[in-house]
UniProtKB/Swiss-Prot annotation:
Expressed by the venom gland. It comes from Agelenopsis aperta. This is Omega-agatoxin-Aa4b. Residues 21-35 form a propeptide. The modification D-serine (Ser) is found at residue 81. GO terms for cellular component: extracellular region; host cell presynaptic membrane. InterPro entries: Spidertoxin (IPR004169). The presence of a 'disulfide through disulfide knot' structurally defines this protein as a knottin. GO terms for molecular function: calcium channel regulator activity; ion channel inhibitor activity; toxin activity.
Length: 83
């Protein structure tokens, strides 16, 4: 009887943990998707320093006075398919 109760409690704990983990994962994915929606996707697209970011972690490069900013490709990482 004690063994059955222990197994039942363990099963409930495992199911609760799995459900909580899936909910957190879904929330994290929604946040990541919303971040990707607010970024510049194309290479050499216009970005703003401290404002609209480039997607996939690409840098936003600006002129010396902080104007004429554009997203530049990450050649090493994208060329090797790491990003």
């Amino acid at each position: 009887m004690k063994l059955c109760m222990t197994l039942l409690i363990t099963a409930i704990a495992v199911v609760t943990f799995v459900v909580a983990t899936q909910e957190e994962s879904a929330e994290f994915n929604e946040v990541e998707e919303s971040r990707e929606d607010n970024c510049i996707a194309e290479d050499y697209g216009k970005c703003t320093w401290g404002g609209t970011k480039c997607c996939r972690g690409r840098p936003c490069r600006c002129s010396m006075i902080g104007t004429n900013c554009e997203c530049t490709p990450r050649l090493i990482m994208e060329g090797l398919s790491f990003a």
